[in-house]
Amino acid sequence: MKLSNLYTKAKEEGKTVLSFEVFPPKKTSGIETVYKALDELAKMNPAYISVTYGAGGTEANNTAIIAEKVKLLGVEPLAHLTCVNNDRVSVEKELDEFKSKGIENILALRGDIVPGVEPKKDFLHASDLCSYIKARGDFELAGACYPEVHMEAKDMVEDI
């Protein structure tokens, strides 16, 4: 179910939307710990569970695997996808994997610049990633913002 529908339904029913966020382990061997945590979180009937994208792209491929586990537990997943360390080919691969696993909600983010790693140039901002994903038409997108003005913006007007 698309997140916008979850929020609409909750509003109509006067309910609060409960969600959790998990992150992929730094090592693949730790994934069982995440699965155990998901089993416990699912018992609390959250509307969705957000799955972050590996910091600096590390173990990022586990995002889809963990999001699929969330879905198998009967909870809607929200998969994070960052762009600063990805090119079009890697983003397309992630999107194909999300789609094959039935994941339809993506939180599109720029991601952190990793010291000593040159950012990819295909998507400089989350808005570039959103436009690319939206053109596919397969996913519902969520985004983040900096209400206090993004650190790289000259001022509020430029940021908006």
What are the residue ranges of the model-derived segments?
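N-terminal amphipathic alpha-helix/helix-capping segment at the start of soluble metabolic enzymes
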Residues: 1-20, 27
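Alpha-helix-loop-beta-strand connector modules within alpha/beta enzyme cores
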Residues: 57-82, 123-143
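Glycine-rich anion/phosphate-binding loops
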Residues: 83-100, 120-124
